[in-house]
């Protein structure tokens, strides 16, 4: 019986170690400079944790070390959308974008205002707006029935309007079809095909807005330059 218990505990310990092995191996590979091997394990982990910003962050780190600034920026951006207050994610995203001549903060926008606008994730802001809505409804009912709490009801109403306006602007940004140049260079053509002349070329890491698609081509706008044209789908990574 004693041997049986020892065997059971040994198997449980082995199972626990085995379950932790993939991420431990990924971290070890990364420390050893085996970034491609670490990337494979992190991407495997992403299948079971699709909304984990730190998995995207680690994937971005691997691509960054491998010199793929476009794919690094795409994954840092995915992490940033989920965890906008994380300093490491924000700094690495800014670094990856700057390597391609881009900036996280749009021209003319004060950095403090940009940081405040993105201080909550989209889901957090949505939750805040819904909570304020229900609180307002409850207080409004109390005021209608008992004529009490008018001042706090008005305060919550103002907060609700501000939150709703903030959410509306964030919703527009969230639903924007954003992409990043993943290839070393992407040619912007006047039409969806190699038979159309290239009007410009854009280095990896530049942010794009996808407007339309046809066959294996996307119609895009290069956000920082205002250039519009068609680019091969294989040259960009949608965020």
Where are these regions (language model features)?
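Membrane-embedded alpha-helical segments of integral membrane proteins
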Residues: 102-145
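Boundary regions of SH3-family modules and the immediately adjacent low-complexity/disordered segments
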Residues: 69, 143-200, 209, 221-239
């Amino acid at each position: 019986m004693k041997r049986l218990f020892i065997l059971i505990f040994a198997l449980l310990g082995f199972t626990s170690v085995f379950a932790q092995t993939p991420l431990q191996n990924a971290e070890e590979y990364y420390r050893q400079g085996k970034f491609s091997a670490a990337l494979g394990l992190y991407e495997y982990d992403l299948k079971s944790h699709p909304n984990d910003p730190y998995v995207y962050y680690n994937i971005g780190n691997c691509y960054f070390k491998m010199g793929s600034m476009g794919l690094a920026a795409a994954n840092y951006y995915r992490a940033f959308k989920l965890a906008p207050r994380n300093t490491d994610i924000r700094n690495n995203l800014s670094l990856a974008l700057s390597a391609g001549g881009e900036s996280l903060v749009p021209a003319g926008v004060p950095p403090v205002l940009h940081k405040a606008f993105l201080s909550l994730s989209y889901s957090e802001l949505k939750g805040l707006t819904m909570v304020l809505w229900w609180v307002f409804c409850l207080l409004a009912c109390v005021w209608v029935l008992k004529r009490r709490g008018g001042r706090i009801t008005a305060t919550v109403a103002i907060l609700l309007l501000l939150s709703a306006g903030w959410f509306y602007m964030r919703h527009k940004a969230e639903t924007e079809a954003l992409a990043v140049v993943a290839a070393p260079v992407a040619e912007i053509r006047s039409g969806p095909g190699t038979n159309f002349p290239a009007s410009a070329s854009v280095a990896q890491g530049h942010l794009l807005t996808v407007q339309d698609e046809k066959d294996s081509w996307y119609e895009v706008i290069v956000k920082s330059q205002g250039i519009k044209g068609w680019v091969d789908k294989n040259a960009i990574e949608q965020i």
